[in-house]
Amino acid sequence: VVGSWNFKFAYYVIGFLIFVGAILGRLVCGFLCPFGLIQDLLNKIPFPKKIRTFKGDKLLRKLKYVIFLVFVILLPLFLTDIMGQGAPYFCKLICPAGTLEGGLPLVLLNKAMRGAIGWLYIWKNTILIVTIVLSIIIYRPFCRYICPLGAFYSVFNKVSIYRYRVDMEKCVHCGKCAKACQMVVNPVENSNSPECIRCGRCKQACPVH
């Protein structure tokens, strides 16, 4: 769609994403994303030491914005085919969700395609395996560091119709909400952080909610 200087801009696609973002923000990530659910289930697998955060975590979270800019916007605009169309480079080169939900089933169910497996398929499956392993240790690594759609929706978190509000008159500053947040957000300090996926764990943990 955005891969040609002569394209007819798909206003309906961008308009729909903006519409959803303006209403829900990253609630989409918390409740509507199937790969988010898969990561949630993987994170429930017991592991000796789960990693909540680490040095460089905040900086690494900026990566999803870089991925959005480079692989969703710039590469499709500047790397085009003879027809002037750009490929969906994020889906083609990175997306582990597409590999798990589309690529793997397609190859497993279609014998004719197995002979066409090349370096790109191996590369994407490597990314998928790394993401799966990290999901057991770290809560939602794909959502935190990679997902360009999460980066897009995060822009709307502070202005979306559905957003969180902390009643400071009732708040007892116990810190339970911050401890409950697996995305490592402190709702008292930033109730509508771009990293908040609206999972509601902070509300469940709040003693005065």
Give the location of each predicted region.
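Non-ligating segments of multi-cofactor redox enzymes
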Residues: 1-184, 194-209
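Donor-sugar nucleotide-binding helix/loop cap in glycosyltransferases
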Residues: 189
